[in-house]
Amino acid sequence: MSNKGQLLQDPFLNALRKEHVPVSIYLVNGIKLQGNIESFDQYVVLLRNTVTQMVYKHAISTVVPARPVNFHPDSESS
């Protein structure tokens, strides 16, 4: 994936991770996963609930935060 493809993904996922926002992740096959984003990279998201699951990004359809989250796509901060 190009760097441009990460301009929205990374800040959004990072804000969810840093603010410990609960999320619902819908997979392309319709399965709903819930938990908190523990970490992510170019290919996977680590989702923590009672256990930590490695979810491949190509299997994700939608990420729905449980509450609104502020993120800034133009600035990367760790």
From Swiss-Prot:
Q: Name one GO molecular function term.
A: RNA binding
> What Pfam families does the database record attribute to this sequence?
Hfq
Q: Please provide one cellular component term from the Gene Ontology annotations of this protein.
A: cytosol
Q: Does the keyword Iron apply?
A: no
Keywords associated with the record: RNA-binding, Stress response
SUPFAM superfamilies reported in the protein's UniProt record: Sm-like ribonucleoproteins (SSF50182)
Q: Where is the Sm domain?
A: 10-69
Q: Does the keyword Cell division apply?
A: no
Which Gene Ontology biological process is one annotated for this entry? Answer: regulation of RNA stability
What do we know about how this protein assembles, alone or with others?
Homohexamer.
Matches recorded under PANTHER family: RNA-BINDING PROTEIN HFQ
* Role played: RNA chaperone that binds small regulatory RNA (sRNAs) and mRNAs to facilitate mRNA translational regulation in response to envelope stress, environmental stress and changes in metabolite concentrations. Also binds with high specificity to tRNAs.
The Swiss-Prot or TrEMBL record describes its family as follows: Belongs to the Hfq family.
> How is this protein named in the record?
RNA-binding protein Hfq
Give the originating organism.
Answer: Paraburkholderia phymatum (strain DSM 17167 / CIP 108236 / LMG 21445 / STM815) (Burkholderia phymatum)
